[in-house]
Structure formats: C-alpha cells, structure tokens
Regions:
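N-terminal "first-domain core" detector
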Residues: 4-43
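HotDog/MaoC-like acyl-thioester-processing domains
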Residues: 7, 11-13, 69-70, 81-146
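Hydrophobic beta-strand-centered segment that forms part of the acyl-chain substrate-binding groove
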Residues: 8, 28, 42-77, 81-89, ...
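Hydrophobic residues in beta-strands and at strand termini
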Residues: 17-18, 64, 110
C-alpha cells in the first residue's frame, strides 16, 4: 500500500452543556468531558482511516483549565498531529462560547488494527505546516517514550 502524506487539518465538534452533563458542583462533569474529548479525537482519525479499524490506546494529559456550566456551548477542535507505523495521535483543544482561552487540551493515541484487532500499518505520514503544527508533532512524538 502507498503512504499518504497529510497536513494537520482541524475537525470541529460542538456540544451544548445540559443539566445532565453536570457534576455535584454544577460544572461540566470530567467523565462527560472525557467522553466528548475521545469522540472528537476519534472523529479526526476516522476522517483518514476506516473507523472500524481504530481503537483508543491512551489519553495523554487531559488538562482542565476552566469550568463549563449549563448552557455553555463547548467547541472541540481536533487534528491528527503525528503518525507512527500503527499509531496515530490526535491533539484536542476545547474552548467554550468562542473564548480564546482553552478549557481543556491534550492528546490521544489511537492504534490502527486489522480484522483480528491486531495492530497493522496505516500508511499515513503527517507533514507539519505551521510552527504550532511542528510543536504539536514533536510533543506527540515524545509521548511515545513515556
């Protein structure tokens, strides 16, 4: 199979925070945020690979910097920033109500698997374009050694 080189492009998903998404403090429950976070990262990878062949390996450093409350619209911006032989890493940046400051950010490593759920090559190569892309590429690459 031929290798496909991609440039990181952003995939956006949005969520409305509702009362059932809140914790006992009245802020967005971390578990719900993690669910949406993984889903957003998965969608970025699934735009490149068959979703049937993608599994989540690890969430790296999902850092919360601000809370969200009922009625907030939360935006998940995801992009594939690194690809190994069988692994592929998404970076997810979360903000609310159009604010510039991050609500949550982090990386997720996914693995490309065959029909027997064994890791197999995906033949994707990531070519960073911007300084931010290069920084995210190197950061994601270094996650492999941790």
């Amino acid at each position: 199979m031929e290798t496909k080189t991609i440039c990181p492009t952003c995939t956006v998903t949005m969520r409305l925070v509702k009362s059932e998404d809140l914790n006992h403090h009245g802020t967005l429950f971390a578990g719900r945020t993690a669910e949406w976070f993984v889903e957003s990262g998965f969608i970025a990878v699934a735009s490149l690979l068959n979703p049937q062949n993608i599994v989540c390996l690890k969430i790296h450093g999902m850092f919360f910097t601000k809370p969200a409350v009922s009625g907030d619209v939360v935006k998940f911006s995801s992009k594939v920033v690194f690809a190994g032989n069988t692994s592929i890493v998404s970076y997810i940046h979360v903000e609310k109500n159009g604010a510039e400051k991050s609500l949550v950010e982090g990386f997720i490593t996914f693995i490309h698997v065959d029909e027997n759920n064994k890791p197999c090559p995906h033949y994707i190569n990531v070519s960073p374009v911007t300084e931010e892309d290069r920084y995210l590429y190197e950061t994601a690459k270094n996650l492999r050694t941790k």
